[in-house]
Regions:
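ATP-dependent carboxylate-amine ligase catalytic core
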Residues: 1-62, 74, 78-81, 86
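Generic secondary-structure signature for well-ordered alpha-helical cores
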Residues: 3-10, 40-43, 92-96, 120-128, ...
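Glycine/charged-rich beta-loop-alpha catalytic/anionic-binding loops adjacent to active sites
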Residues: 7-18, 69, 156-164
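A conserved, hydrophobic alpha-helical segment in the catalytic core
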Residues: 28-42, 62-73, 112-117, 163-184
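Conserved catalytic-core segment of NTP-binding enzymes
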Residues: 51-126
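Short, flexible, mixed-charge acidic loops at enzyme active sites
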Residues: 62-66, 146-151
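Beta-strand->loop->alpha-helix junctions that form or flank phosphate-binding loops
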Residues: 108-112, 121-144, 163-169
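Gly/charged, well-structured mid-domain segments that form the phosphate/adenylate-handling core
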Residues: 130-140, 144-147, 154, 158, ...
Length: 184
């Protein structure tokens, strides 16, 4: 990212970034720099985490065939609202129809209010759905030296003896999402 940081610094010092139009947030600048680095690399697959929302987030410019939504809670209430349904509606914005590609929504465990909103968005954009504990799940965990052994149910079948070098059930959740998103 260093070359992209230098471009921003040079343009800033030259006064080229102080235009009277809309200003980019630090997150938007860093996101744009990351996308430029991905294009320059190039990468085959990029895991891009949404900043705060989804609907208006800078990362939403990516034509992503897979959208992963982890469990939704009350966060950033001053920006996203104070209800789970309202927050879910904002976060559902990352599930979008992408021209020329099928969209898959990988959805983690949700309270019913959030799940209803997310599923409604998948219907609107005709996205396929994979829900935790329905289409995919961790079927078993065993403590192992240096981590844990997992048995996962994915869309493509059963995966046994998956070593995760981290301890705890909370560490197995992200692995499920990442493995499923990668397989899509």
């Amino acid at each position: 990212i260093e070359p992209f940081v230098q471009i921003i610094v040079q343009r800033s010092e030259a006064g080229e970034l102080g235009s009277p139009g809309p200003q980019m947030s630090k997150f938007e600048v860093v996101t744009a720099m990351a996308f430029a680095a991905f294009a320059d690399a190039p990468v085959d697959i990029a895991v891009v985490e949404v900043g705060m929302s989804g609907r208006w987030d800078a990362t939403n410019v990516v034509a992503a065939p897979v959208a992963v939504i982890t469990p939704i809670g009350i966060d950033h209430g001053e920006y996203l609202g104070e209800s789970i349904g309202g927050i879910a509606a904002e976060k559902a914005g990352i599930i979008g129809a992408r021209e020329g590609t099928d969209t898959v929504a990988v959805i983690g465990r949700q309270v019913p209010e959030a799940m209803e909103v997310l599923l409604a968005q998948t219907v609107r954009v005709d996205a396929a759905v994979a829900r935790e504990d329905s289409e995919f799940a961790v079927l078993g965990r065993q403590v192992a030296v240096g981590g844990q052994m997992l048995e996962l149910q994915g869309l493509g079948g059963l995966y046994s003896d998956i070593f995760l070098p981290l301890h705890g059930d909370h560490q197995a959740h992200p692995l499920r999402f990442g493995d499923l998103a990668r397989s899509e």
